[in-house]
């Protein structure tokens, strides 16, 4: 027979468990909103630095906070501009909302700062009329068999990274047209971005344009998981998900897990 004391203890235990769960959920939400957020990359515009279906760890605090960087609050105009703002650095890989489509997120490399003059001539970046250091270091063949020339580029602040250009035969097939551009003058408060996959990136050279600082969400840091194929898809049934589990596991790119996005020691 259950006594009143037993019932009271049971109720207390249930309440304690509920409050513990609520506390854990609140902490997780705060971390997601203020500290870090994972992102999945759906396109190859940053190939081969970042591949399709790479899962990226990014830090929210790197540039401070704006309406667009605070998860779950980006639809509420809490304030203008950024709070606790920290200036981005040339060469950062940034997650942001493109001004021409605020419903999606892009990830690109920051090349031009406010006040900069940017131009590409024969695939070489010129910043304020000075070309950056660019050296061909090898080739890269993607998982779908497309071959790229691989270059090591050094920005004026000393930041180095790899960029990729379609090999000549593929350049003809995919209509390479981004290697020579007009001159871009970066306005105050805005930034110029490029994809590391230079011939296959929708960036500031084409439709994207300049990106306001307010649109920055986070700074990408490293890859925490990576697969060649997606397992989850809202358009397929449960049985198909079960059938896709084995090939999905086999498609995990173990060599990319915990890869630092700023490491050029290859």
From Swiss-Prot:
Enzyme Commission number: 3.4.21.89
Enzyme class: hydrolase
Keywords assigned by UniProt, alphabetized: Cell inner membrane, Cell membrane, Hydrolase, Membrane, Transmembrane, Transmembrane helix
Active-site positions on this chain: 45, 108
Membrane topology: Single-pass type II membrane protein
Membrane-traversing stretches: 21-41
Pfam families (UniProt xref): Peptidase_S26 (PF10502)
Catalytic activity: Cleavage of hydrophobic, N-terminal signal or leader sequences from secreted and periplasmic proteins
Protein name listed in UniProt: Signal peptidase I
Source species of the chain: Rickettsia akari (strain Hartford)
